[in-house]
């Protein structure tokens, strides 16, 4: 009799466990599906701030884009002289063509990073799941989570993201690039020797371990070093760098990485993974793949930087963006001889989708393309 009671109780406990497990799994799948639905369904015309009778694409962008300012924005910015920074311009223009646009997240992770549900529930590159201890250890040493005080105090910020594209060569855009308040550079793209075309100023350099400059003398003074974490090893690498520990070449990197970054901890930041997630699934519409890194669903660092700038800058420009796949022998980057055809070998990026996204922004004057490569 005692055995029967034990078996009955065991079965009841097992059933309860299965029911709770099913409910938890269902809730998780529903949470994930909000991303998949937004990328696979035509949005209703009266949802998310959209205007009735206006046509939008499957992501929520206006179908008919032009370079004319909406009437209310034309009035708002009518008295600004040419070249003057227009407060709120980029976000206002973005909202006009993409009503779902919002600015809920800080540029960089801070000591409250655990409260952000959007990144807490995804593994890198789309979130921080499993990285709490590493991030906490890094932030306990860096202790700085914002731009510099001088930049934070600006009433209006003009930002430019300098891409690495060969389209920058011989454009002589250096002085125009240096006129911006914030100059964002990507990975190991050099400045020295290319100042005439790419400028000499660097405010932020965003990179990941394999993309970081390996020679300490290449790093610019007075710039912030920003990690974009695409895998858990990237956060581990940054901890090594911050604590000045030895970096092992066998720590899961796909090429050699920098073993030293000549920056003090307060000059180091961690890019909020929200912007990788937002660029991939909300703005570009890349495959969701259950929130995991997969074929063709990782945005390039350039598109991620644009997404970040739309959130943190009043005006946004780009230079050195654009891959012309019809000219396979053109230089891929302004600083080396690798040809355009090499980009086709990438399995993580969807260049065509990104081009469509960036063209929308340029056509609607959300961003300015100085080198006309998009």
Curated annotation (Swiss-Prot):
Q: Does the entry feature the keyword Glycoprotein, yes or no?
A: yes
Question: Might you give the EC number(s) for this enzyme?
Answer: 2.4.3.6
Q: Which CDD domains match?
A: GT29_ST3GAL3
Reactions catalysed, semicolon-separated, are: a beta-D-galactosyl-(1->4)-N-acetyl-beta-D-glucosaminyl derivative + CMP-N-acetyl-beta-neuraminate = an N-acetyl-alpha-neuraminyl-(2->3)-beta-D-galactosyl-(1->4)-N-acetyl-beta-D-glucosaminyl derivative + CMP + H(+)
GO BP, sorted A to Z:
ganglioside biosynthetic process via lactosylceramide; protein glycosylation
The SS bond pairs are 159-313
Q: How is it modified after translation?
A: The soluble form derives from the membrane form by proteolytic processing.
Q: Which Pfam families match?
A: Glyco_transf_29
Q: Where are the transmembrane segments?
A: 9-28
In terms of Gene3D superfamilies, this protein maps to:
Glycosyl transferase family 29
Where expressed (tissues)? Found in all tissues tested. High expression found in brain, liver, kidney, colon, heart and lung.
User: Might you report a single GO cellular component term?
Assistant: Golgi cisterna membrane
InterPro entries attached to this UniProt entry: Glyco_trans_29, Glycosyltransferase_29, GT29-like_sf, Sialyl_trans
| Protein's recorded name | CMP-N-acetylneuraminate-beta-1,4-galactoside alpha-2,3-sialyltransferase
Q: Which organism is it from?
A: Rattus norvegicus
The gene it comes from is St3gal3
């Amino acid at each position: 009799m005692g055995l029967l009671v034990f078996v009955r109780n065991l079965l009841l406990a097992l059933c309860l466990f299965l029911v709770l497990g099913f409910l938890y799994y269902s809730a998780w799948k529903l949470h994930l599906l909000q991303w998949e639905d937004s990328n696979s369904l035509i949005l209703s015309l009266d949802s998310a701030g959209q205007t009735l009778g206006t046509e939008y694409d499957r992501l929520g962008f206006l179908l008919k884009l032009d370079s004319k300012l909406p009437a209310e924005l034309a009035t708002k910015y009518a008295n600004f002289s040419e070249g003057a920074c227009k407060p709120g311009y980029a976000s206002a223009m973005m909202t006009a063509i993409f009503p779902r646009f919002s600015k809920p997240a800080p540029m960089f992770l801070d000591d409250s990073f655990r409260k952000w549900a959007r990144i807490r529930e995804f593994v890198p590159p789309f979130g921080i799941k499993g990285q709490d201890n590493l991030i906490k250890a890094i932030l306990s040493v860096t202790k700085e989570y914002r731009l510099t005080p001088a930049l934070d105090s600006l009433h209006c910020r003009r930002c430019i993201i300098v891409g690495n594209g060969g389209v920058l060569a011989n454009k002589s855009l250096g002085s125009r690039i240096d006129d911006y308040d914030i100059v964002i550079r990507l990975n190991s793209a050099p400045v020295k020797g290319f100042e005439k075309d790419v400028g000499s100023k660097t405010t932020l350099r965003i990179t990941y371990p394999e993309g970081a400059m390996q020679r300490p003398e290449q790093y610019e003074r007075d710039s912030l070093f920003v990690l974009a974490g695409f895998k858990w090893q990237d956060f581990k690498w940054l901890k090594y760098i911050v604590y000045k520990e030895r970096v092992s070449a066998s720590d899961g990197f796909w090429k050699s990485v920098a073993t030293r970054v000549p920056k003090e901890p307060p000059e180091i930041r961690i890019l909020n993974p929200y912007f990788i997630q937002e660029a991939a699934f909300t703005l570009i519409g890349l495959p969701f793949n259950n929130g995991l890194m997969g074929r063709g669903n990782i945005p390039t660092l350039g598109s991620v930087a644009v997404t970040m700038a739309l959130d943190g800058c009043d005006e946004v420009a780009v230079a050195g963006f654009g891959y012309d796949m019809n000219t396979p022998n053109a230089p891929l980057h302004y600083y080396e001889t690798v040809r355009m055809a090499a980009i086709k070998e990438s399995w993580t990026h969807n260049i065509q989708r990104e081009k469509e996204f960036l063209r929308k922004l340029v056509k609607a004057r959300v961003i300015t393309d100085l080198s006309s490569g998009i």
